[in-house]
Amino acid sequence: MLAKRIIPCLDVTNGRVVKGVNFVELRDAGDPVEIARRYDEQGADEITFLDITATSDGRDLILHIIEAVASQVFIPLTVGGGVRALEDVRRLLNAGADKISMNSSAVANPQLVSDASARHGAQCIVVAIDAKKVSADGEPPRWEVFTHGGRKATGLDAVAWAREMARRGAGEILLTSMDRDGTKSGFDLELTRAVSDAVPVPVIASGGVGNLQHLADGIKLGHADAVLAASIFHYGEHTVGEAKRFMAQQDIPVRM
């Protein structure tokens, strides 16, 4: 069984790391280079950087931050936010990113995922899906895809969309539950399991981690291949090392 990954997520806006609840109420968590270096030292498997307002504000890529981080951090970096064209993918990879995450742009232009995967390889293309439950209690569960930092409904079914993105060459799906984001109440395990079981590529569970048990649940009950968290790491509640030791105690294979 492949080792399961623990991935701290850095949401960046205006050059600072921030964290919100349900995609709003952002508070400052510090300098991206310092925070990334700390996670590297703690033994994180990867780091994900999301420029959370680039697409909605129409801003350019955070190349200078990526260059600064890549020069000091030696684990894989996934970068997303403001990726609109094949040229953006190339520029971010050249700046030191290892994987590129697309969200709004994949919905606007699914061919971009196919083209980027064909040119650079599926292993460096991640499609991020922000999903919100839209079915009522008692109905079969259904989740809708949202874009533009969770501000725009698309009408797309999250499970079907994940399948389509994998078919087009996404090497990985980064799945965030908007209902759980920042709530510390645990992953939406039903959503995570539905997508993980539907696609042939790794799924990273995101949104809602409040304790170490939630991370383990994402793997064991959500069938995710990796778990992503922000709040519990940024504000010093837990280190990545503590998370890995906890998961190892639950017989989840991790790189120590």
UniProtKB/Swiss-Prot annotation:
Q: Has keyword Amino-acid biosynthesis?
A: yes
Active site per database record = 11, 130
Set out the biological process GO terms recorded for this chain's protein: L-histidine biosynthetic process
Disulfide-linked positions: none
What is its EC class?
Answer: lyase
| Gene3D superfamilies xrefs | Aldolase class I
UniProt organism field: Ralstonia nicotianae (strain ATCC BAA-1114 / GMI1000)
Task: Kindly state which reaction or reactions the protein catalyses.
Answer: 5-[(5-phospho-1-deoxy-D-ribulos-1-ylimino)methylamino]-1-(5-phospho-beta-D-ribosyl)imidazole-4-carboxamide + L-glutamine = D-erythro-1-(imidazol-4-yl)glycerol 3-phosphate + 5-amino-1-(5-phospho-beta-D-ribosyl)imidazole-4-carboxamide + L-glutamate + H(+)
Which pathway, metabolic or otherwise, does it act in? Answer: Amino-acid biosynthesis; L-histidine biosynthesis; L-histidine from 5-phospho-alpha-D-ribose 1-diphosphate: step 5/9
Predominant localisation class: cytoplasm
Lineage of the species this protein comes from? Bacteria, Pseudomonadati, Pseudomonadota, Betaproteobacteria, Burkholderiales
- Known role: IGPS catalyzes the conversion of PRFAR and glutamine to IGP, AICAR and glutamate. The HisF subunit catalyzes the cyclization activity that produces IGP and AICAR from PRFAR using the ammonia provided by the HisH subunit.
Q: Name one GO molecular function term.
A: imidazoleglycerol-phosphate synthase activity
Tell me the Pfam families matching this sequence: His_biosynth
Record's InterPro entries? Aldolase_TIM, His_biosynth, HisF, IGPS_HisA/HisF, RibuloseP-bd_barrel
Report the family membership: Belongs to the HisA/HisF family.
**Where in or outside the cell is it found?**
Cytoplasm
A GO CC annotation given for this chain: cytoplasm
Query: What EC number(s) does its UniProt record assign?
Result: 4.3.2.10
Q: How does it assemble?
A: Heterodimer of HisH and HisF.
Q: What is this protein called?
A: Imidazole glycerol phosphate synthase subunit HisF
Name the source's superkingdom. Bacteria
Keywords, alphabetical: Amino-acid biosynthesis, Cytoplasm, Histidine biosynthesis, Lyase
